[in-house]
A protein has these predicted regions:
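Intrinsically disordered, low-complexity linker/loop segments enriched in Gly/Pro
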Residues: 103-104, 126-180
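A generic structural signal for residues embedded in beta-strands
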Residues: 63, 119-122
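Boundary at the C-terminal end of the N-terminal hydrophobic targeting segment
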Residues: 21-28
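Short, Lys/Arg- and Gly-enriched loop/turn segments at beta-strand edges
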Residues: 68-80, 127-137
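Residue-level "contact hotspot" at macromolecular interaction interfaces
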Residues: 54, 110-113
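Short, structured beta-strand/loop micro-motifs enriched in basic residues and often containing a Trp
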Residues: 36-46, 98-106
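Bacterial N-terminal signal peptides
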Residues: 9-20
């Protein structure tokens, strides 16, 4: 399921504690990190990847995330073309370095002052659905039962952002409550 426009606040706890202890009140900033061909990794995060955004402890970041599927497959499954995000089209066409996983990951984000071994606190302040659908899919040789299904299938699941539910099937509504 796609959740987007996640607003996060990052805290480098050791740095935050140090600044507070010294009575320094750093000015907090707010950023927006869009999912673009230059700000995503497809299928993996490389520890050597350069950060696409640098922030300080206490800063707020609104992060756009994307559904992990191709526009062609989504449209073939019944998603109207106007509901497929342009950023997904751009990333699908332009990102050539794709790892073994299927997920499109926005980032990485570098937190100034954070060091190896630090504990980072991330607060998710809000989640807003960017598209009115999710999907579930399987294919041969994939998933938990790779040998049981020699064919592929994808189900588009309509989302109701007002009620925060997924209309999985007639009479089956799944609440869209985050796990945190």
């Amino acid at each position: 399921m796609k959740r987007t426009n996640v607003i996060l606040t990052f805290f480098a706890l050791s740095t935050f504690a140090l600044l507070t202890a010294q009575g320094i009140h750093a000015q907090q900033a707010a950023y927006t990190l869009k999912a673009t061909p230059k700000t995503v990794a497809w299928g993996y995060y490389d520890a050597k990847a350069a950060p696409v955004l640098r922030i300080k402890s206490g800063d707020t970041v609104q992060i756009d995330t994307l559904i992990t599927n191709s526009p062609k497959r989504l449209e073939a499954a019944g998603v109207p073309p106007e509901q497929v995000e342009q950023s997904l089209r751009d990333i699908t066409e332009q990102v050539k370095d794709k790892g073994p996983g299927g997920h499109i990951l926005t980032g990485p984000i570098y937190i100034e002052g954070a060091e190896i071994g630090d504990v980072l606190e991330v607060k998710i302040l809000a989640i807003k659905l960017a598209i009115p659908y999710a999907y579930n899919a399987f294919g041969p040789g994939r998933g938990y039962l790779p040998d049981d299904y020699p064919y592929a299938k994808m189900k588009i699941i309509p989302l109701d952002a007002q009620r925060m539910i997924a209309n999985f099937a007639p009479g089956i509504e799944i609440p869209l409550h985050p796990f945190f």
